[in-house]
């Protein structure tokens, strides 16, 4: 974290220090658990398309946005600008709220699964709920520490 701060005045890491600084190392876990959520939902029969459509939107959007941010941090796109700290905090707050709503809706869709769905699809949806709540927790933690970083910048 010190090299990024020394080079441009930013507390955002660049290069591979993204993978060793907190809270930015959470990108890896957000990427993994977010990807698992949309893969599990896509592979199951969708019992409530409208509800799970929102869950798919949130998980794919956050997966792509997290991947984009992580790549931009690695290549140093932020260039030491403090506006990137604001962007980071805002994104993670929005992602945490979106994922919380998606987690609750996925739990609702799983609870209300009716006859005609196999146990395999039911278990895939249960796993998607668990991973969605893990992703929510990761985004909340990242949002809190990004807000702390934003306030101190």
UniProtKB/Swiss-Prot annotation:
**Intracellular or extracellular location(s):** Membrane; Cell membrane
Source domain of life: Eukaryota
Give each disulfide bond as a residue pair: none
Q: Does the keyword Zinc-finger apply?
A: no
Q: Which InterPro entries match?
A: MAL (IPR013295), Marvel (IPR008253), MARVEL-CKLF_proteins (IPR050578)
Q: In which tissues is it expressed?
A: Exclusively expressed in white and gray matter oligodendrocytes in the CNS and in myelinating Schwann cells in peripheral nerves. Higher levels are found in the PNS than in the CNS or spinal cord, in the gray matter than in the white. Weak expression also found in spleen and kidney.
PROSITE patterns for this protein: MARVEL
Q: Where is the MARVEL domain?
A: 18-151
Cytoplasmic face residues: 1-24, 76-92, 148-153
The post-translation modification note in this UniProt entry reads: Lipoprotein.
Which molecular function GO terms apply here?
structural constituent of myelin sheath
Q: Name one Pfam family in it.
A: MARVEL
Residue spans, topological domain Extracellular: 47-53, 115-125
- What topology in the membrane does the UniProt record assign? Multi-pass membrane protein
- What upregulates it? Up-regulated during myelination.
Q: Name one GO biological process term.
A: protein localization to paranode region of axon
Which purpose does this protein serve, as stated in its record?
May be involved in vesicular trafficking from the Golgi apparatus to the cell membrane. Plays a role in the maintenance of the myelin sheath, and in axon-glia and glia-glia interactions.
Subunit comment: Interacts with PLP1.
Protein name (record): Myelin and lymphocyte protein
Native species: Rattus norvegicus (Rat)
Q: What is the lineage of its organism?
A: Eukaryota, Metazoa, Chordata, Craniata, Vertebrata
């Amino acid at each position: 974290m010190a090299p990024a701060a020394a080079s441009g005045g930013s507390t955002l890491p660049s290069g591979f220090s993204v993978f060793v600084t907190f809270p930015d190392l959470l990108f890896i876990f957000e990427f993994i658990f977010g990807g698992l959520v949309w893969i599990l939902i896509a592979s199951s029969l969708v019992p409530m398309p409208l509800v799970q459509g929102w869950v798919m939107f949130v998980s794919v959007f956050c997966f792509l946005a997290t991947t984009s941010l992580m790549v931009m941090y690695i290549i140093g796109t932020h260039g030491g600008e403090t506006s990137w700290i604001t962007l980071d905090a805002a994104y993670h707050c929005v992602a945490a709220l979106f994922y919380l709503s998606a987690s609750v809706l996925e739990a609702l869709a799983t609870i209300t699964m009716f006859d005609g769905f196999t146990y395999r699809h039911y278990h895939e949806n249960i796993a998607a709920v668990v991973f969605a709540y893990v992703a929510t927790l990761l985004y909340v933690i990242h949002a809190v520490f990004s807000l702390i970083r934003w306030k101190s910048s």
